[in-house]
Amino acid sequence: MAHDMDRSCDSRKYTYFFPTYLLIPPRPGSDLFYSLRRQNGEPPTHQFWDFLANGGDSDQELVTRIEELQHKRAWRIGVAELNALRATVGRFEGTHNFHNFTVDKDFRDRSNQRHMKIIQVTDPVVHGETEWISVLLHGQSFMLHQVFGF
C-alpha cells in the first residue's frame, strides 16, 4: 500500500498573511458600508476615513485610489484592534460545524465537524510601507474537503 501524505496526517497548519489595513471598517458611502447598514444597522465608522473630508485634496469630491492606498499603507493597527481580532478568531478554536465548506452534506451531518486546535494572530510587522500580520490555522479533519480557512 502506497503512502498517501494527503490522508496520513491528523492535522494541518496553514498560515495566511494580509495587510492590517484590511481591518479598517468600510469607507462611508461605499457599497459595503450600505450593505452592512441594511443587514446590521449603522456600521462602525473609523477615524481613518476622516482624511477624505479633512486631509484629502479639497478640490475633489473623492481622493484618488492611489492616495487612498497610500493612506492605507501608512495606517497601523492599534493594540485594542489587534486584541479584538485575536478574541474574534479565538471563538473559532475548538470543534465547530463547517457545513458551508462541504459538498452535498446536510447541515446536521456530524462529518461536517472540524476541530481547530490553534488560531494564532502574530504581532504586526512592517515590510516596505505596509504593515502585515499573519494568521496561523492549525486544525484537524480538514483533509477530505480541504477547508483552508474561514
Regions found by a protein language model. Give the residues of each.
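Structured-RNA-binding interfaces characteristic of tRNA pseudouridine synthases
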Residues: 1-150
